[in-house]
Amino acid sequence: MEYKTHDLSKQSCSVSAALLFQAGEWMYIEKISLKGYRNLNEMTIDLKNGINIFYGANAQGKTNFLEAIYICASGRSLRTRNDSQLIHFDAPESHIQIHIKKENRNDKIDIHLKKENKKGIAVNGIPIKKLGDLFGTCHAVIFSPEDLNLIKEGPGERRRFMDMEICQMDAVYYYNLQ
């Protein structure tokens, strides 16, 4: 299998993106642009079908880059509930944009974050009113050290994890959880 590497200490370059499968439909992220997001103040990366390898020294933004993708899939950070913490310290707001290529269509997700903890989400240029309307556009599963709680903690933690993953594939499931 072909792969390319990407050093996150550079501002912009071309890399390969992992091919994702969901219910027989393939998808991959073609492009991601970040502006005013955590320590990745401004970057655009064009992705191609294949495998991603992101590398760099500590505190270069590898986890922040993956978190930005997760936010586009779920509408939420995996590390904080306070969206203002996602904004670069000297920026008034943050913007995340991803272009997704799917078997039958292309989608674009825009996330705008403001210091007042205001968030705007648009799919293909259309603002969404409910978080559940985002689900199904981009699929992402992230495992972090905190996910060891899936094994250590009780069944409630495992249910929460599975609920969030299923919500990405079925917005109706999300609304039924409410």
Where are these regions (language model features)?
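Pre-Walker A-like glycine/lysine-rich segment at the N-terminus of P-loop NTPase domains
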Residues: 23-71
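Extended, charged coiled-coil helical stalks used as long, distance-spanning scaffolds
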Residues: 174-178
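Nucleotide-state sensing region of NTPase/ATPase domains
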Residues: 73-149, 155-157, 163-169, 173
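Short, cationic motifs built from Arg/Lys/His that form the positively charged side of catalytic pockets
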Residues: 38, 158-159
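Short coil-to-helix segment of the ABC ATPase nucleotide-binding domain corresponding to the Q-loop/switch region
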Residues: 66, 157-158
